[in-house]
Amino acid sequence: MTGSGGAVIRPASPDDHDAIWQILRPVYRAGKTYCIPRDITRDDALADWFAQPFTAFVAEVDGRILGTSHVGANRPGGGAHVANASFATHPEARGRGLARALAQHALSWARAQGYRAMQFNFVVSTNLDAVHLWQTVGFGVVGRLPGAFLHPRHGPVDALVMFQTLKGDSDEP
């Protein structure tokens, strides 16, 4: 799939591990947006990113991987009809529409897989760019977890639960 700014979004492979780690490492080390140990190892981070039931994707611009996402069931069993996704982009991708392209791809992919909704369980409220992006692609805030994230600079901040229905009223159950 070709996304915004000429990005090609495709399923990730083991050959992409180094590039994905180069994107994830600074995000995780900063500790501002994910509930991931800041000192997570490369192997543990990649095992998590590629873990079932998720499918990992990369976004390439001019042959260079500048973004990644993974999409899969939010919960097993009775919650398996709701998707979840995570995203990260390289700093060079800022302002180029790559995060939006990854989000739109994730939503399209989830619809094609038969998911009826997508939920983000833990969006850090101080991650204003992400909150704004998710709202502009159709997510609403359906819950607020007071002080649930320990931000390295701001201390305890709220985490948001964001949700979007993927199927319309005319869709069969």
Model feature map: region roles:
Residues 95-112, 131-136:
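Conserved acetyl-CoA-binding loop-helix of GNAT-fold acetyltransferases
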Residues 14, 30-92, 103-104, 109, ...:
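Acetyl-CoA-dependent GNAT
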Residues 2-5, 87-88, 122, 145-147, ...:
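Terminal substrate-recognition subdomain of acyl/acetyltransferases
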Residues 8-20:
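A short beta-loop-alpha structural element at the N-terminal edge
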Residues 20, 24, 45:
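Hydrophobic pocket/interface hotspot
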Residues 110-123:
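Conserved GNAT acetyl-CoA-binding A-motif
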Residues 135-145:
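Conserved acetyl-CoA-binding loop of GNAT-fold acetyltransferases
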Residues 94, 120-130, 148-150:
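Conserved beta-strand-loop-alpha-helix junction that forms the acyl-donor binding cleft
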